[in-house]
Amino acid sequence: MKFLMQSISGRNRSLVRALVSRRYFASSPEEIAKRNYANDLSEYNTAVNSVTAQRRHYLLRDVYDDMKLDGVQPTADIFHSFVVGTMKGARLSDAFFFREEMKAMGIAPDVNLYNFLISTCGKCKNGKEAIRVYDEMKRYDVKPNGQTFVCLLNACAVSGQLDLVYAIVRDMTAAGVGLNQFCYAGLITAHLNKQPRPDNLSTKILEFVEQSKGWSAIDSSRKSAEDVMFSISEEELYNIPTADYSHRTRFLQRNLTVYHVAFSALADLKDVKATEALLEMLKKDGKDTDTYCMLQIMRCYLHSQDFENGLKLFQDYMSADKIPAMELYTTLIEGAMTGYTDNGMKIAQDTLIQMNERNFFLDPRTGSNLLLKAAGEKTGGYTVANMIWDLMLARNILPTLAAVEAYYKGLKEREIPEDDPRLMLVTRTYNNLRLREGTLPNRR
């Protein structure tokens, strides 16, 4: 069979793809032929990196299928590229698939690949699976490094498994590995995600920030050459909340990692008093807030419905000749909608106008999130939701099904004629999205 497959080429190869590939059953041979990602190992490596960069992680298995059909023999390096792609896309089953394929070909996973697998477990909030990966490392005599322990600690922290987190800390101590800022960030995350949350959680968070000061200079997670090659920041590898901002040097001071995680946690807890205490600690350290810290402090005030202080922070930042960031506008808009008060919705409306005047535009994810929240307004004129819809429509941006559904239902709850142009457009968009995603009932 293998000989037969390899002997088929040219026009007939697209037919083989149609018969063999996992995802091509509904495609024509011509369409399938166009999906031939590459022809040799070097081109396939480029294709994998390109798919990952485009965040089309769901295509990685297709690329691999195509590679096998071309008879291209995978190497350890390209398997690493595949696993990094699944890590960035949080596709745990695909990550394990590539690991098993490696083993089947006699390629032994190394410590870096195991670190990527553990990180993927963390992204999928599966600490127990991360422990299984770590146990597999020990069975195969793969020596863990500092990154392994920090990946493992943060993977367990995301799912709030305090017992496992402290067991890892003990293992680190026994191995002579010091706790760095990412470890303390993980400890804060673990306590935040533990259910039920203790009453003194805010105090505990402040204690961890204080404790971290004596250890922040210890480097237990030196970046590997492989991390650099794949452009993986430590924040991304360890699933730190600032991962999406780690490459924005004017947005983020990377030496404030523990403060970033602490401010984010206190914002989740809506603890204004503890947030202000943490801000004083930061000032006593002789450091200033970066943009990420400002976002979390704003979020804490706004979600506590202290709109006055939240708005003041925003205005002070904008008048201080600092570089404006889109996230400042969207954080204020989202937070001001908390409780759907008249004052808050007016702030959200005014901020949307300012944002548009400053030529900041909503992207699909942010716009959908804001529309979803704005659509929850039960009273009032629905002005903010309508504005967000119009701003996205003006740039031909289609919101997610969840956002459109919420907006559609909100419009239907109001006394709007069935032939209203807005309602008709939203209804048509809603039905088209449901049809595309297979949730619209078949009317046969």
From Swiss-Prot:
One of its GO terms (cellular component) is mitochondrion. It comes from Arabidopsis thaliana. Signal peptide: none annotated. Keywords: Mitochondrion, Repeat, Transit peptide. GO terms for molecular function: mRNA binding. Belongs to the PPR family. P subfamily. It comes from the Eukaryota. It is found in: Mitochondrion. This is Pentatricopeptide repeat-containing protein At4g35850, mitochondrial. Its main location: mitochondrion. The keyword Mitochondrion applies. It holds the Pfam family PPR_2. Residues 1-25 form a transit peptide. InterPro entries: Pentatricopeptide_rpt (IPR002885), TPR-like_helical_dom_sf (IPR011990). PPR repeats lie at residues 40-74, 75-109, 110-144, 145-179, 255-289, 290-325.
